[in-house]
Amino acid sequence: MTSALRETFTGLRDIKGGVLEDPETEYRPGTITLPLFFSKADFDLEMIKRAVSHVGGEGTRRALGLLCAFVIAETVPSGRGTVAELLEALGFLLESLETGAPLEVTFADPNNKLAETIVKENVLEVVTGLLFTCALLTKYDVDKMATYCQNKLERLATSQGIGELVNFNANRGVLARIGAVLRPGQKLTKAIYGIILINLSDPATAARAKALCAMRLSGTGMTMVGLFNQAAKNLGALPADLLEDLCMKSVVESARRIVRLMRIVAEAPGVAAKYGVMMSRMLGVGYFKAYGINENARITCILMNINDRYDDGTSGGLTGLKVSDPFRKLAREIARLLVLKYDGDGSTGEGASDLIRRAEMASRGPDMGEEEEEDEEDDDSSEPGDSDSFL
């Protein structure tokens, strides 16, 4: 690990301004067509409850399509135009899609407990909240989603007035079935994102949409940016110098993408338009390429260790970070040496390569054998970072 790791920490000092442009990746909503689902059948409460109960079962795709059609039909933005006008104003192209016949009664009802909480007075809020929750499976894997449901969903749902969502079935098999139909590029996925954007466009529902899903779906890497800025401030280091000490070659492409994306987001007027740009990244054909702006788990690990030296408890967030145990130990040493290097004096002290060499020597214990010498691939976290600090 050591020699290969030393080579990757070469920094970005030779990468000048224009090189960080990313001319190949497009983040424009005008390249995305969002479906507006509709149903020829009249909606009634029992039909909606049946669809909710089927979410997570064999009829998940049809159930979610029908629920999208219901929300689109029932949503009347407060003085902001029609649903279609709102999405067109954000720059998206639209198409109408029929959901097909209503679902039949079956025994496959994994979300029956949630369905039974639905009454006429809360049906729109509960169904919308369910779609928000399901949308997270476009970014969270099943384990992450199960953890989210266990640790966060009840608190967030209750705070947003949809406490019924505590009855959402977080069984891993159920979550896997939902995630299987919400893949990048699928029309159902785009339809749900459209509903999120509709809610973000309406001041009456924007806070709920942000709290329950949008801040976790934007994927801008702002969590890492916030950690970086705080570390630079704590160290008294120039951001460019700290970047040289931390950046790996593997994130140069990510840097290009995030610079371009953030410039476009900065130009977008209004909260919904900004989210529209960010979400268009996740809905276009270049999804997997554009998704490369995820935070780098190793750098985040180091930054958290730096900030923990100034604000005890910061490193508590390292529990779910996917890095090897040897690297965790190395990250602590790098953080310690960076504090010694800068010590509030800016860019004085030894260079990055010497710093990494010293950290490697200090972090190597007697139990670290030859197997840890091999090159380690970049372990990005499966959760790209909740972008709660963006807005």
Swiss-Prot record:
Subcellular location: Virion; Host cytoplasm
MF terms (GO), sorted A to Z: RNA binding
Acidic residues composition-biased segments: 368-391
Keyword line: Capsid protein, Helical capsid protein, Host cytoplasm, Phosphoprotein, Ribonucleoprotein, RNA-binding, Viral nucleoprotein, Virion
GO cellular-component term (any): host cell cytoplasm
Disordered: annotated span: 347-391
A Pfam family hit: Rhabdo_ncap_2
Keyword Ribonucleoprotein set for record: yes
Function summary: Encapsidates the genome, protecting it from nucleases. If expressed without protein P it binds non-specifically RNA and therefore can bind it's own mRNA. Interaction with protein P abolishes any non-specific RNA binding, and prevents phosphorylation. The soluble N-P complex encapsidates specifically the genomic RNA, with protein N protecting the genome like a pearl necklace. The encapsidated genomic RNA is termed the nucleocapsid (NC) and serves as template for viral transcription and replication. Protein N binds protein P in the NC through a different interaction, and can be phosphorylated.
Subunit structure, as described in the record: Homomultimerizes to form the nucleocapsid. Binds to viral genomic RNA.
Protein's name in the database: Nucleoprotein
Name of the gene encoding the protein in the UniProt record: N
